[in-house]
Amino acid sequence: MARLQQHYREKIAKDLTEKFGYKSPMQVPRLTKITLNMGVGEAVADKKVLDNAVADLTKIAGQKPVVTKSKKAIAGFKIRENQPIGCMVTLRGVQMYEFLDRFVTIALPRVRDFRGISGRAFDGRGNYNIGVKEQIIFPEIEYDKVDALRGLNISITTTAKTDEEAKALLAGFRFPFKN
């Protein structure tokens, strides 16, 4: 069992039950999945760029990402239908908690000029999105072997019904919110 998973079961679930007054343990919000998405627009011109992005995301997530393809042609972006334009990976279970632990304790403090993450990036249904500008904040990525700095989007999906519940859940996982 992952360290954060154990912390959730022993402490966070009890704290949330006290704070929000849940009647059943199944009402307590929990993490469902974490999705890492890397959009690689340069893949239109050079296929090697996408291979490097897939390799980076594999190192970060610990599992092989799926290549995402365009849904329709957009002439302005020089994209044809079903053309590879990015990659994504969905983490669940132990891998999800391990990634979250590394992200909060190791990767976020390595962000340049870091002052905390925004408390307003919730979607209204208890899910949280955070954008990372550089993939080199993760310790698995070797700085010397990076061909280009690429960002990625991290979507944290929870069972929380409101943003307030989701924020309390993520704060329990020691997310460094600004306010």
UniProtKB/Swiss-Prot annotation:
Disulfide links within the chain: none
Keywords in alphabetical order: Ribonucleoprotein, Ribosomal protein, RNA-binding, rRNA-binding, tRNA-binding
Any one GO BP annotation for this protein: translation
InterPro entries: Ribosomal_uL5, Ribosomal_uL5_bac-type, Ribosomal_uL5_C, Ribosomal_uL5_CS, Ribosomal_uL5_dom_sf, Ribosomal_uL5_N
GO molecular function terms listed in the Swiss-Prot or TrEMBL record: rRNA binding; structural constituent of ribosome; tRNA binding
GO cellular component, one term: ribosome
One Pfam entry name: Ribosomal_L5
Alphabetical list of HAMAP family matching this protein: Ribosomal_uL5_B (MF_01333_B)
Function of the molecule: This is one of the proteins that bind and probably mediate the attachment of the 5S RNA into the large ribosomal subunit, where it forms part of the central protuberance. In the 70S ribosome it contacts protein S13 of the 30S subunit (bridge B1b), connecting the 2 subunits; this bridge is implicated in subunit movement. Contacts the P site tRNA; the 5S rRNA and some of its associated proteins might help stabilize positioning of ribosome-bound tRNAs.
Subunit structure: Part of the 50S ribosomal subunit; part of the 5S rRNA/L5/L18/L25 subcomplex. Contacts the 5S rRNA and the P site tRNA. Forms a bridge to the 30S subunit in the 70S ribosome.
Family in the record: Belongs to the universal ribosomal protein uL5 family.
Cross-referenced PANTHER family: 60S RIBOSOMAL PROTEIN L11-RELATED
The protein, known as: Large ribosomal subunit protein uL5
GN (gene name): rplE
